[in-house]
Amino acid sequence: DKNLRDSLKTIKFDYLNMAGQPIDGTVKYVIVPQQKDEKLYVYKNYVTAKANEDIALKPMSSGAYRLHAICGTDTVNTDFVLFSMDDKQPVITTHDWFYLSDNFFPRDGSPVYLQVGSSDKNQHVVYSIYAGNKVIETGSFDQSNSIKTRKLFYKEEYGDGITLNYAWVKDGVLYSHMQSIA
């Protein structure tokens, strides 16, 4: 699960009975860096909080994490990734990093952010941007263990929106993305 670092401000642990109704309780949790081997996880310095209430999180740096929580007799592990638009490389090892901040251009004129990349070396990425039947832009770029971030602002020539196409091949495998922004 990829999460934009600036948007993850709170978490909430739902503690429910069999009928799905919230019940009082406390939860112990800790957030630790993800490990490649399950045996390497060490859980200590737990934080205790009330269940069913928003819990403010301290700012965290980009990276891969595990949330380990205990509530009653239940134990939950959730892995997640935090990243920012300022990251220059994927924060995890991945052949395919693609992120689009929204599928709609904001009415206030602010941009939609696009990130494309991989932790692999030597990629040749090709792309095209269409509005209806009109080609707006085509191009390519080379990158190695990096992310390319673009700010896309709405332009009148886009009409009802644009379609983005990005693709690259690595070790005989095609990675491609087609997304629309209205």
Where do the model's predicted regions map?
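A structural signal for beta-strand and strand-to-loop patches characteristic of beta-rich domains
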Residues: D1-A182
